[in-house]
Amino acid sequence: MPSFTYLTAALALTSSVVASPVEKRDAFEVKQVAHGLHRKNGPAQIAKTLRKYGKAVPAHIQAAADNNAVVQADANTGSDPAVPSDQYDSSYLSPVTVGTSTVHLDFDTGSADLWVFSDLQAKSSLSGHDYYKTDASKRKSGYTWKISYGDGSGASGQVYTDKVTVGQVTATAQAVEAATSVSAQFSQDVDTDGLLGLAMSSINTVKPQQQTTWFDTVKSQLAKPLFAVTLKYHAAGTYDFGYIDSAKYTGAITYVNADASQGFWGFTASGYSVGTGATVSSSISGILDTGTTLMYVPAATAKAYYAKVSGAKLDSTQGGYVFPCSATLPNFSITVAGVKQTVPGKYINYAPITDGSSTCFGGMQPDTDIGQSIFGDIFLKSKYIVHDMSNGTPRLGFAQQAGVSS
């Protein structure tokens, strides 16, 4: 599912970040729930990622996204309701109680804002959404937030201090960013009521003073100041807060210090391999982002991968690499701290480009227009990833997910 924020909004560090008290708890699991069904549109995912990271969307990618949307809309008018099951993608979100309201949020390790649809918006923009019911007495006077993308889309609003409950833990005075205005791109995405950012608080967009993420607010009250992500292939995943669940991974967890200099959970891989081929020595610096659907790697890496896929090509009319849906895709691995982290080939087949098409869109694409590699859900769905702040310095743990062959 999509997510929305590293923005072109000013993200400079302020002198301090406000923390809030919590009710003490221990450790718990948050299960995602299926919340809506939508058609996959590869070029639209690329466009969304570019906007999220403040980059311009090239005309050919936007045209491909728009064209695929039109083709799919036309298909909806036909009499045959049957479409390939892999053309659909469930939205897996997490229920969160904000104040007295239960909303379904996208947990996003690529942003640091907790923002929600609210009753401050025009009613027309709330259609299909659950939303936060504000209490004027809890408003942080003079505080605002704004998400701004290069194409003019975005969202903005006021800031409240309220209870936010995730699983068993309640932050009793969490900064909640209540939307007053959202662009059509957001309001039309009825699957998601907002997001809960899990990146570093240093890129929170609240002004005049940045606020802590929900995790930073509660981490001192957890059994351990960490969370682990288990996204699933064609299934709901989980987020574990305060503990590591050994039943969810195989082998050992490989730890590396995270590069948080830009506010993200960053790391550097020392190489990659395709299928059973030899490891190619190549430094790949990227971030882990649960709010990004696809996986973006250096252009040379993507080219090397698709060179091993019969019939694959970089198609400008589709905005990325495509291949025959019948093709067998090789596994893809990156090397982190000397250990291979492997994505099964079938995970890299994102979807047919349109209903009934025999051409499929790749789940791995070049990072050329983004400027950094992003390891999104295509990568994460085969992994158990630990985000650890135990020593005050962020580190990442990588392990193969239980039940996923490497």
Swiss-Prot record:
GO terms for biological process: proteolysis. It comes from Phaeosphaeria nodorum (strain SN15 / ATCC MYA-4574 / FGSC 10173). The keyword Ribonucleoprotein does not apply. PANTHER family: ASPERGILLOPEPSIN-1-RELATED, BETA-SITE APP-CLEAVING ENZYME, ISOFORM A-RELATED. It is an enzyme of class 3 (hydrolase). GO terms for cellular component: extracellular region. This is Aspartic protease SNP2. GO terms for molecular function: aspartic-type endopeptidase activity. Residues 1-19 form the signal peptide.
